[in-house]
From Swiss-Prot:
It comes from the Bacteria. The keyword Membrane applies. HAMAP family: ATP_synth_a_bact (MF_01393). Key component of the proton channel; it plays a direct role in the translocation of protons across the membrane. GO terms for molecular function: proton-transporting ATP synthase activity, rotational mechanism. F-type ATPases have 2 components, CF(1) - the catalytic core - and CF(0) - the membrane proton channel. CF(1) has five subunits: alpha(3), beta(3), gamma(1), delta(1), epsilon(1). CF(0) has three main subunits: a(1), b(2) and c(9-12). The alpha and beta chains form an alternating ring which encloses part of the gamma chain. CF(1) is attached to CF(0) by a central stalk formed by the gamma and epsilon chains, while a peripheral stalk is formed by the delta and b chains. This is ATP synthase subunit a. Its main location: membrane. One of its GO terms (biological process) is proton motive force-driven plasma membrane ATP synthesis. It is a multi-pass membrane protein. InterPro entries: ATP_syn_F0_a_bact/chloroplast, ATP_synth_F0_asu, F0_ATP_A_sf. SUPFAM superfamilies: F1F0 ATP synthase subunit A. Belongs to the ATPase A chain family.
Length: 255
């Protein structure tokens, strides 16, 4: 903070920049915004995170090969044990929600979503990096993939009875229930994407404000809060995805 400047005056001087940061959160290509580095940055960061994850997965695969040659298992946290705990937890969650058979069948979607969202969220901990999941384009893309696939899985498992099931058990209630069910199903990707974008974007914005005001020590508690937000939002997205897939693939009760 410059000399002979009050704290309130200094804070007010930062407001134009903070407002600009707030406007950039969730900016999409659909509006009247020109595509600049702010628009391409989330895409670049998403690609970078996916490449990084592939490299880490390759390293873990190499560790498994070396593990087969060793007699004593590792007793410390390594990249391999972290991946085991990470994907083991989400597989257990999918098994509890969808059942063992569906968890094994649909875990590639859940595990892939968990990895991408977690590492994208975690990039917010790096100073100067805007997490891809703070942009609505990226979160909508993730949510649309889940939306398309759980409907595809539902049609694959139950056929057209999956669509008929949306009309409810009684035919005379179908004109009322069917539109409500269709709307509630179509709203799912909207709520998934907006919830993730707002939580990560606002958390990152608040952390940026405090880092701009006080660079040392004070933002440390916010970093712990950010870690909680990162984990919770990954869990929420994947848990809801499991629920949607479970509801879509359960055998319809015909009346």
């Amino acid at each position: 903070m410059p000399e002979h400047t009050g704290f309130l005056t200094y804070l007010l001087a930062q407001l134009p920049g903070l407002r600009e940061n707030a406007r950039n959160i969730g900016k999409t290509f659909i509006g009247h915004h020109t595509v600049d580095y702010r628009g391409t940055e989330p895409i670049f960061m998403s690609l970078l995170i996916m490449v990084l994850f592939v490299l880490l997965a390759s390293e873990v695969r190499g560790q498994y090969r070396r593990l087969n040659e060793s007699v004593i298992p590792e007793d410390k946290l390594t990249l391999r044990t972290f991946f085991e705990a990470f994907f083991g937890y989400f597989y257990g969650m999918a098994r509890d929600v969808m059942g063992p058979a569906n968890a094994k069948r649909y875990f590639p979607l859940i595990g892939g979503s968990a990895a991408f969202i977690f590492f994208s969220n975690a990039s917010a901990l790096i100073p100067g990096v805007n997490p891809p999941t703070s942009n609505l384009n990226i979160t909508i893309g993730c949510a649309v993939v889940v939306f398309v696939l759980f409907n595809y899985y539902g049609l694959k498992e139950n056929g057209w009875s999956y669509v008929a099931h949306l009309a409810g058990p009684k035919w005379y209630l179908a004109p009322l229930i069917f539109p409500i069910e269709v709307i509630s199903t179509c709203v799912r990707p909207v709520t998934l994407s907006i919830r993730l974008m707002l939580n990560i974007g606002v958390d990152h914005l608040v952390a940026s404000i405090f880092l701009g005001l006080v660079a040392l020590f004070v933002p440390v508690p916010l970093m712990f809060l950010a870690i909680i937000v990162i984990v919770v939002q990954t869990l929420v997205f994947c848990l809801l995805s499991c629920i949607y897939i479970g509801l879509a693939t359960e055998k319809a009760d015909h009346h």
